[in-house]
């Protein structure tokens, strides 16, 4: 298996948040073995765990003790892919910067600054098959010695039905895939107070028969690649790198988190949490 890992030095990222439209800054701090992944905002530590999820509509948000951080899935996905197990992610602002809409900038900076530690990783290993479903969407998890994630989408435009499978070792096949939306969704997203920082610089915008971004798609199946990337980020809310085989049909953050909670419950996940017994979401 592998050793726990942190970063060699502090790493900083900054930019606009896709939903708040506000400027924010992120500082990743090295931590010792056994610390885990945690966020830090205004004096409050928020463990990157499913118990602290407070919102899953168009993003995965965490909160604790009156502090909330939006859109954690991309940075968590990169940390998961690189098996970084011990860092504190300091957030100055209310949301993780969206950067170009993909995980590439996070991935490149962190990959070059990995520090192996002296403790073996305690992986979360899927022990038996489990399925979660909701209104025609489903995710299935099965045992596997590696992490394998398949996403199948059914889109109401020129994309049609697409499918992509990620296997360990092919991280660069998904970290460049950008977050996306459809032009008919934009009005609703804005109406509910989200997407304030979205633009063609950080979001792949698709119509019935066109791509609005002048550079076009990075891959013909870029949206399903990004969905795989998102799911890997949400899976890291189990608290450890995951070994299992996953298949998602039309899943999103809400179903991803539902799966995580079911896996944790079924396997009686009782790892120590760095907080007092009662966990209260915002």
Curated annotation (Swiss-Prot):
UniProt entry keywords in alphabetical sequence: Hydrolase, Lipid A biosynthesis, Lipid biosynthesis, Lipid metabolism, Metal-binding, Zinc
InterPro entries the UniProt entry points to: Ribosomal_Su5_D2-typ_SF, UDP-acyl_GlcNac_deAcase, UDP-acyl_GlcNac_deAcase_C, UDP-acyl_N-AcGlcN_deAcase_N
Pathway terms, separated by semicolons: Glycolipid biosynthesis; lipid IV(A) biosynthesis; lipid IV(A) from (3R)-3-hydroxytetradecanoyl-[acyl-carrier-protein] and UDP-N-acetyl-alpha-D-glucosamine: step 2/6
SUPFAM superfamilies: Ribosomal protein S5 domain 2-like (SSF54211)
Catalytic activity: a UDP-3-O-[(3R)-3-hydroxyacyl]-N-acetyl-alpha-D-glucosamine + H2O = a UDP-3-O-[(3R)-3-hydroxyacyl]-alpha-D-glucosamine + acetate
Effect of residue 19 to A: 20-fold decrease in activity. 2-fold decrease in zinc content
A GO MF term: metal ion binding
Binding site for Zn(2+): 74, 226, 230
Effect of residue 222 to N: Loss of activity
UniProt-listed Enzyme Commission number(s): 3.5.1.108
Known outcome of mutating residue 19 to Y: 22-fold decrease in activity
Any one GO CC term of the record: membrane
UniProt record, GO biological process: lipid A biosynthetic process
Homology family: Belongs to the LpxC family.
Protein name, per record: UDP-3-O-acyl-N-acetylglucosamine deacetylase
Gene that produces this protein: lpxC
């Amino acid at each position: 298996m592998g050793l726990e890992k942190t970063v060699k030095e502090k790493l900083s990222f900054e930019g606009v948040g896709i939903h708040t439209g506000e400027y924010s800054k992120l500082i990743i701090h090295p931590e010792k073995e056994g610390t885990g992944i945690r966020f830090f905002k205004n004096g409050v530590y928020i463990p990157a765990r499913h118990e602290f999820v407070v919102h899953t509509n168009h993003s995965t948000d965490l909160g604790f003790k009156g502090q909330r951080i939006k859109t954690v899935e991309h940075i968590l996905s990169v940390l998961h892919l690189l098996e970084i197990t011990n860092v504190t992610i300091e957030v100055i602002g209310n949301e993780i910067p969206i950067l170009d809409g993909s995980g590439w900038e996070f991935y490149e900076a962190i990959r070059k600054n990995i520090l192996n530690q002296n403790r073996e990783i305690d992986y979360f290993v899927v022990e038996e098959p489990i399925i979660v479903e909701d209104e025609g969407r489903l995710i299935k998890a099965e045992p596997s010695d590696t992490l394998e994630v398949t996403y199948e989408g059914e889109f109401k435009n020129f994309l049609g039905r697409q499918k992509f499978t990620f296997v360990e070792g092919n991280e660069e096949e998904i970290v460049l895939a950008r977050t996306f939306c459809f032009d008919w969704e934009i009005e609703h997203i804005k109406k509910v107070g989200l997407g304030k920082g979205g633009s063609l610089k950080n979001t792949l915008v698709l119509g019935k028969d066109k791509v609005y971004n002048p550079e076009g798609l990075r891959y013909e199946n870029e949206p399903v690649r990004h969905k795989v990337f998102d799911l890997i980020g949400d899976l890291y809310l189990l608290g450890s790198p995951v070994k299992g085989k996953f298949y998602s049909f039309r899943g999103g953050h809400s179903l991803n988190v539902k799966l995580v909670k079911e896996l944790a419950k079924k396997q009686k996940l009782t790892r120590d949490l760095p907080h007092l017994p009662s966990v209260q979401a915002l």
